[in-house]
């Protein structure tokens, strides 16, 4: 059996808590809006690529989002999305 047949378990480090992720995303969202960007597409671009250029320095947004692991942000987004769909 090849390793492609086995399911790998992914664990996210417990560095940031839910409030940190929510607060950071809210601040980044506001900064993107203020600069005239589409916040959703810019955040998605950042999460998919890891390129901080998707997030402006305005209101320290780039620094704020850079303090969080992208996998932790994605985990929080999926958790909230699925909990609202139950």
Swiss-Prot record:
It comes from the Bacteria. Coiled coil: none annotated. InterPro entries: IreB (IPR009309). Signal peptide: none annotated. Transmembrane segments: none annotated. Belongs to the UPF0297 family. This is UPF0297 protein BBR47_19030. It comes from Brevibacillus brevis (strain 47 / JCM 6285 / NBRC 100599). The lineage of its organism: Bacteria, Bacillati, Bacillota, Bacilli, Bacillales.
